[in-house]
Design a protein with these regions (language model features):
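Intrinsic disorder/low-complexity detector
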Residues: 1-10, 46-74, 116-122
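A structural feature that tracks compact, well-ordered secondary-structure segments
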Residues: 3-31, 40-44, 67-97, 101-109
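Short amphipathic alpha-helical linker/capping segments at the junctions of internal repeats
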Residues: 33-36, 55-59, 98-101
Length: 122
């Protein structure tokens, strides 16, 4: 079972969505308050059923938000981000060497986010 791990950082508070094996699937931005951080978690739960826009394919179809976007970063790695209905990025992934692994990350968000418990980081 996955979990949202809430963590205080120097500039505020953020969360990671972790898979059952403890691996980080996606990371949020830094929020100024715990309330806004928890709202971000609810937004991931609500929007994780979104479709996938694969921006690595030439002539890709632009989808409406909410959506997952797959893209290639400056280092040439595949990444995904989940955008809310308002276009804000809610969570983003680490870099993946293969697009198939990136897609598995998205599937893991879809599987884990709806039922994931919210816990405070140690």
């Amino acid at each position: 079972m996955g979990k949202f791990e809430v963590k205080k950082v120097k500039t505020g508070i953020k969360f990671n969505l972790k898979a059952g094996n403890g691996e980080i699937i996606a990371t949020s931005e830094v929020y100024s308050s715990e309330k806004s951080c928890l709202n971000g978690i609810e937004s991931v739960r609500k929007n994780c059923v979104a479709d996938i826009e694969d921006q690595t394919v030439e002539g890709f179809e632009k989808l409406k938000n909410p959506k997952f976007e797959i893209y290639v970063d400056k280092a040439g790695e595949f990444r995904f981000r989940l955008k809310a209905k308002n276009g804000e990025t809610i969570v983003a992934s680490e870099g993946y060497k293969a697009k198939a692994s990136c897609k598995k990350g998205i599937e893991s968000v879809k599987k884990n986010a709806p039922e994931a418990a919210v816990v405070n980081a140690e």
